[in-house]
Amino acid sequence: MMIVDAQIHLWAKGKPSAHHRQTPYLKEEALADMDAAGIDRAVIHPVMWDPDSNELAIEAVRAHPDRFAIMGWFYLDQAEQRAAIETWKNRPGMKGLRFYFSDPRSQSWPDDGTLDWLWPVAERLDIPVSLQASAFLPRVGQIAERHPRLKISIDHMGVPRATQGAEAAYRNLPQLLALAKHPNVAVKATGQAGYALDPYPFHSLHDALHRVFDAFGPRRMFWGTDITRMHCTWHQCVTLFTEALPWLKGPDLEMVMGRAFCDWIDWEV
């Protein structure tokens, strides 16, 4: 079974978010960790705290094109950067875009019209977009309906940033499940182990994982870790899905653990 981590971060400089490790994480360490945990591939999500993180990710792809792909970013509030999207997928390993809106300046963008130009252009160019959308899940449904050929994936099952404990983490779950009716919306089940307060195998998470699987199915639910903020091992993040969930097995397990996300972002298997 091919195992593909749907979200990792690499960075060489800058001040990481408080819930991530505070030292750089480079491709050499990531590859060693992946090999130790049995991870075949990983999709790099360049970080905004390192302004050169897109190029760092491209360097990783050039060195290891069979191991890494990228969901990159650019400054959405700088009009001069908008032209970059037209040739975005011409960059090595660049499979899509990923954005999050954590600072006060950007939190209103999904609703105030700032991003209205982005959705039709990404749809036209067939560029998948991944969003940290916990604060605007209903808005994602509106975008998906208006742009039915735009592929949208929701980071971390819609869990708000820096949340701890399953009850708090899954308070948006009804809003997330409501998006399953849109065939162009998928869910990244990334970083889930980091929300558990109970020990491995994190039984507090299992019901929500099952409900998301039942709603979205194996082709629109993607396993991953966001490994640099996990309090458990990469291997435990794997076996949470491959061993601890009795309802996830066979071809469905293979899809969730990597094949489905590769298909979603058109990363050749």
Residue ranges and their predicted role:
Residues 1-4, 23-41, 210-211, 216-222, ...:
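Mid-to-C-terminal alpha-helical segments outside catalytic/metal-binding sites
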Residues 3-6, 44-46, 71-72, 98, ...:
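Active-site neighborhood of phospho(di)ester-bond hydrolases with catalytic His/Asp-centered motifs
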Residues 7, 34, 57, 88, ...:
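Conserved, mostly hydrophobic/aromatic
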Residues 11-14, 49-52, 77-80, 102-105, ...:
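Active-site environment of divalent metal-dependent phosphoester hydrolases
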Residues 22-33, 54, 78-89, 171-172:
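Short, acidic/polar
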Residues 51-135, 142, 188-192:
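Active-site gating/metal-coordination segments in enzymes
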Residues 108-222:
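Catalytic pocket-lining loop regions of alpha/beta-barrel enzymes
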